[in-house]
Each structure stands twice: as C-alpha cells, then as structure tokens.
C-alpha cells in the first residue's frame, strides 16, 4: 500500500451524453472497448464517464491478463506516455501486505498498479495458479471482461443507496473501513461488480490490505 499525491477529481458538468470510454455495457455486464485501453487514450483520459446512466468519477479499474508476463508487457507500453508504476508487479497478498492477511490461496493474484497523469489508477492483475478464482473468472467471462470498476464517491452509504436503486446489491453486510479507505463491492443480477470507494481527507492510499482481503472474500460469500 502506498500513499500517493492523487489529484482531486471533479466532474465536468458539461460532459457530453456520449463520451469516449474504455467500457461497453452488454446485457448488464461491462467489457473493455479495445480502442480505448491503449496507453495513448488512458494517459489522456479524465477518468470521468457514464455507467448505467450515471455520471461517475472513476478511481480505478482492473484489467485482467492470462499471465504475469503479459501483464508486464502491457504495462511497459505505458512508460513513454507518463504513466508511473506505483505498485508491483508482485503476488498479492504475501508480497504486498506487511501484516498477516488470511485469505485462501485461491484468491491470490499477481498485481500491478499504474498511476495515470489525470490521477486515476489502472490496476493490472493475473492468475497466480491454473484453476484459481481469477483464472475461472477469465474462462467464464473472457479476457475482455471488466472484473470491477471503482467509483470515487463522497459518501459510500449515500452512493450505495443510489446504486441499490439500480439493482446493485451489496456483497457484504457493511462497507469495509479499516482506517484508510472506505470501500464496498456491489453486484447486479448479471454478475457485474462495481466498487464504491471513499477516500478519507488527506489519505490517498492505493489500497488497504484488510479492506482488499474483505472485498476478495465477499466475492465468494455471495
């Protein structure tokens, strides 16, 4: 976990109804638009878009790769465009968290985080073993699938009400908050996960190990 000088994201209230976005909605699920996950686009993108008829500020999103080698090759393409490596690549949780994080090895993954010039984070992950949870996700949804998108909000509880009205249900009894971030996974009937993330004033940590462990465990609890 690193504490970064992330930019404060503010909405452009004049954002057009149709904007270029890395995401495509299909039958309730999100997929990546291959035209807009290239470094030339993501390093100039504002991290604002529309999702499920809601204008949102994206804190981070996850791109999943078949292997760590492919993850690293993709990351290298960003270096000439001003993106910064802020974490990884390494194995989560054992090489990320100083405290003992007790999650089954089925939920471990290779992880890397890139900071874009606009202040948004692009998280890259890959299975750590054949047949693990991340590998099964890829086989079920395909490599274009979006595992989750994290929407930055001012108040997680208030935002959760908005998204529950869009038929996204919380995947755990409460939001996770171990002191640095407040985060909550919600999922719609199609199986798409969105994350609501509230960054506490003065804290711009990339993630909280206990929170992430809780989020990962919530995926197998539903």
Language model feature labels by segment:
Residues 93-100:
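Long, acidic/serine-threonine-rich intrinsically disordered regions with weak helical/coil propensity
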Residues 1-87, 101-171, 180-222:
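Glyoxalase I/VOC metalloenzyme domain signal
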Residues 89-91:
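Solvent-exposed serine/threonine-rich low-complexity stretches and specific carbohydrate-binding patches
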């Amino acid at each position: 976990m690193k504490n970064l000088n992330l930019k404060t994201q503010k909405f452009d209230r004049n954002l057009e109804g149709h904007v270029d976005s890395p995401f495509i909605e299909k039958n309730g699920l999100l997929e990546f638009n291959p035209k807009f996950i290239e470094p030339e686009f993501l390093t100039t993108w504002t991290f604002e878009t529309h999702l499920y008829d809601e204008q949102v500020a994206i804190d981070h999103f996850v791109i999943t790769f078949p292997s760590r080698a492919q993850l690293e090759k993709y990351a290298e393409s960003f270096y000439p465009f001003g993106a910064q490596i802020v974490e990884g690549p390494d194995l989560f949780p054992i090489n990320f968290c100083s405290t003992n994080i007790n999650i089954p090895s089925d939920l471990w993954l290779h992880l890397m985080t890139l900071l874009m010039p606009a202040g948004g984070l692009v998280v890259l992950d890959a299975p750590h073993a054949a047949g693990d949870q991340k590998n099964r996700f890829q086989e079920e949804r395909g490599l274009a699938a979006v595992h989750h998108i994290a929407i930055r909000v001012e108040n997680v509880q208030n935002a959760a009400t908005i998204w529950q009205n869009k038929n996204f249900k919380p995947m755990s009894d409460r939001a996770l908050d171990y002191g640095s971030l407040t985060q909550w996974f919600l999922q719609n009937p199609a199986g798409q996960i969105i994350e609501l993330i509230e960054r506490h004033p003065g804290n711009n940590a990339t993630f909280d190990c206990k929170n992430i462990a809780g989020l990962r465990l919530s995926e197998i609890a539903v």
